[in-house]
Design a protein with these regions (language model features):
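Membrane-embedded segments
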Residues: 77-103, 109-121
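Zymogen propeptides
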Residues: 53-95
Length: 233
């Protein structure tokens, strides 16, 4: 039985300053050279396969993912529809017999003890889990957006893992760069964090519109620090 790590959440989506910024970020000519200038209609409640434009059912999507070991499922943090899609993907992969591991952006690896307890300890209440795992300090978004995913994982024995680094590492990278990290902090990161992608920078900047008084005209040094932090996160 093949394992698949489903990583929920992509933080940059939550940085959008408004509708105009959202539209700019969704209309950038970036990515695969063969497709970056193409547009395709999106069908309500449908799954559009971008390479060929085919419409897929959820079971067909799960079948196409048979050889995939790591799957990223993005979100807008406060939009429930994104979380329903994440749950449906996890459900279909589980239904297909995959060993699904749910990777969580909101938790660092150091929180693994509480994620393991959430799955294995029936006496741990939701309130106890949120308190002991520091949900609102680590993440801050309403638990109800994510509750169905956590409950499904618990009821079906799916492992959940924290895939992020501690916030102090991200904050140091933002303020001082990678050279400001201690040896202990550096050991928590991969050998290289890619901050050189021009298209990633273009996408990141698109989320900050001119109408965003806080971020729209930020100095280059501030943008670079935020971008480094985003890449590290």
């Amino acid at each position: 039985m093949k394992r698949i790590l489903v990583v929920t959440a992509l933080a940059v989506v939550g940085l959008a300053a408004g509708a105009q910024a959202d539209e700019r970020a969704l209309d950038l000519a970036i990515g695969d050279l063969a497709r970056k200038d193409r547009e395709m209609p999106i069908v309500l409640d449908g799954i559009t396969e971008a390479a060929e434009g085919a419409l897929l059912t959820p079971p067909e999507l799960a079948e196409r993912l048979d050889d995939v070991q790591v799957l990223f499922v993005g979100e807008s943090h406060t939009d429930m529809e994104f979380h329903r899609v994440q749950l449906r993907v996890i459900q279909e992969l589980h239904r297909r017999g995959r060993t699904v591991i749910v990777g969580l952006e909101m938790y660092p690896a150091a929180a693994q003890e509480w994620l393991d307890r959430w799955i294995s300890d029936e006496t741990l209440t939701e309130e106890g889990f949120l308190d002991e795992s520091h949900w609102y300090r680590s993440w801050g978004y309403n638990w109800e957006y994510y509750r169905d995913i956590f409950v499904f994982a618990r009821e079906n024995g799916l492992r959940m893992v924290g895939v992020n680094v501690p916030r102090d590492v991200v904050q140091t990278v933002r303020r001082e760069g990678f050279e400001g990290l201690s040896e202990e902090q550096r050991a928590l990161l991969p050998e290289r964090v890619d901050t050189d992608s021009a298209e990633h920078q273009q996408l990141f900047r698109a989320f900050f519109g001119d109408e965003d008084s806080l971020h729209g005209n930020m100095p280059p040094a501030l943008f670079e620090g935020m971008f480094r932090a985003q890449c590290t996160w």
